[in-house]
Amino acid sequence: MTSVRKRKMNRSSVKKVSRRNKDKQKKKLIACNPIIAKNWDYSLTLAQNYEKLGLKAKLQTPAGGQEAKYDTVIKKEATIDPVTQFGEDSDSDSEEDSSNSQEDNEGQNVEDIDENEIPEGEARIIRDAEGNVVKVVYGKKKVFDIDDDIDTIKAKLADQQKEETEVVKQLEAFASRPIVKKERVQSPREVEWLEKLYKKHGDNYKAMFFDRKLNIYQQSEGEIKRKMRKWKSENNIA
């Protein structure tokens, strides 16, 4: 047997508020920017959309948890040759490889390494056939010259960066558009208030500041002076 309260609820025409049928995967409309909203794919995640548009979801370097890209094939070479792993000729092959590597190391000339082609802050280690360090060549190539202009440095940075997408170009053009500055218009009540102050005190802004009846919002002397200057220019008052 139900209680009186339950019977009243059942007879009531007001429906029960329930979130059971609420769509949790509700489509969130992008209204911040018309270009992003036009190119936004609602079937992708935020990070996937940003990558597709050529933007960054996080400014800092990601610490992990990135989505794996299955379209790129990464080939890894085996450390041990599977054919000769259990064969009889494995020892002879390894000896030939070691002799070839020794010949390559011995044939490497120090003069072939140009220190001006190595970036500043890096070095190349030259070893002999036994693996001992013969010489360390430090780089002298400067990434940015101090004497270069800002335009030259920007051009170098632009060359190093990857090619921008069409969406990024549209966003840059949208951001660099000329914006007309909208000046503030004084309201009718503000004009009436300034007129009363001028008729009562003239150009005595200090008296306007200490007027308790008119300056009820305790505006400073400088604020009243700026508003009064604008009001005078609009009404052609010297």
Swiss-Prot record:
Please give the biological process terms from Gene Ontology that the record holds. Answer: ribosomal large subunit biogenesis; rRNA processing
- This protein's source sits in the domain of life called Eukaryota
Pfam families xref list: Nop16
Q: Region Disordered: start and end of each range?
A: 1-26, 80-122
GO annotation, cellular component aspect: nucleolus; preribosome, large subunit precursor
- Name the keywords, alphabetized: Nucleus, Ribonucleoprotein, Ribosome biogenesis, rRNA processing
Compartments, record wording: Nucleus, Nucleolus
User: Could you tell me where the Acidic residues compositional bias lies?
Assistant: 88-120
Q: Which InterPro entries match?
A: Ribosome_biogenesis_Nop16
What quaternary structure, including any partners, is listed in this protein's UniProt entry?
Component of the pre-66S ribosomal particle.
Q: What does this protein do?
A: Involved in the biogenesis of the 60S ribosomal subunit.
Family stated for the protein in its record: Belongs to the NOP16 family.
What name goes with this protein?
Answer: Nucleolar protein 16
The organism of origin for this protein = Candida glabrata (strain ATCC 2001 / BCRC 20586 / JCM 3761 / NBRC 0622 / NRRL Y-65 / CBS 138) (Yeast)
Q: Name the gene that codes for it.
A: NOP16
